[in-house]
Amino acid sequence: MNSMFRFWIPKTSISMQLRMLSTQTRQALEQAVKEDPIVLFMKGTPTRPMCGFSLKAIQILSLENVASDKLVTYNVLSNDELREGIKEFSDWPTIPQLYINGEFVGGSDILASMHKSGELHKILKEINALAPEQPKDSEEETTKKD
């Protein structure tokens, strides 16, 4: 046999199973990230995050004053297919994952960096995803009445 036409395949790649994202799961994820302006895939819920990174992401979005009607969250711990599927969908190995207007932004470290630089606030403002600010006068009046 001519060795020029033989291909060497390492044993590990033979036993390695590559999970392909099903068409149904891919379509569901595409719809989920495009359906709402801001979508966060996280461990737990906004009121009960189940990991420090998900907590950090929620805190950053809260500091940015994201309107609650613009944000949808998905608890990846509620469904194994969702947890693994979103990692394959984004080609990003960790949770949380933030999408803005259907585009993958990143995880909690990227969010923190964008928050610190002001870039995240600028994007959120451009897409009208920020909650209306409370007038300063009403806060002062409340304090004076107490």
Curated annotation (Swiss-Prot):
Ubl conjugation found in the keyword field: no
Gene3D superfamilies with a match to the protein in the record: Glutaredoxin
Binding site residues for [2Fe-2S] cluster: 51
Keywords recorded for this protein, A-Z: 2Fe-2S, Iron, Iron-sulfur, Metal-binding, Mitochondrion, Redox-active center
Inducing factors: By nitrosative and osmotic stresses.
Ranges for domain Glutaredoxin: 26-131
PROSITE patterns: GLUTAREDOXIN_2
Disulfide bridge partners, by residue number: none
GO molecular function, one term: 2 iron, 2 sulfur cluster binding
GO-annotated biological processes: [2Fe-2S] cluster assembly; [4Fe-4S] cluster assembly
InterPro entries in the record: Glutaredoxin, GRX_PICOT-like, Monothiol_GRX-rel, Thioredoxin-like_sf
CC per GO annotation: mitochondrial matrix; mitochondrion
Pfam families: Glutaredoxin
Location relative to the cell: Mitochondrion
Major location (coarse): mitochondrion
Residues that, per the record, bind glutathione: 43, 83-87, 95, 108-109
UniProt effect for mutating residue 51 to S: Abolishes iron-sulfur cluster binding
Known function: Monothiol glutaredoxin involved in mitochondrial iron-sulfur (Fe/S) cluster transfer. Receives 2Fe/2S clusters from scaffold protein isu1 and mediates their transfer to apoproteins, to the 4Fe/FS cluster biosynthesis machinery, or export from mitochondrion.
Complexes and interactors: Homodimer. Interacts with ISA1 and ISA2.
UniProt cross-references to PANTHER family, sorted A to Z: GLUTAREDOXIN FAMILY MEMBER, GLUTAREDOXIN-RELATED PROTEIN 5, MITOCHONDRIAL
Family: Belongs to the glutaredoxin family. Monothiol subfamily.
Protein name from the UniProt record: Monothiol glutaredoxin-5, mitochondrial
Taxonomic lineage from the root: Eukaryota, Fungi, Dikarya, Ascomycota, Taphrinomycotina
Gene: grx5
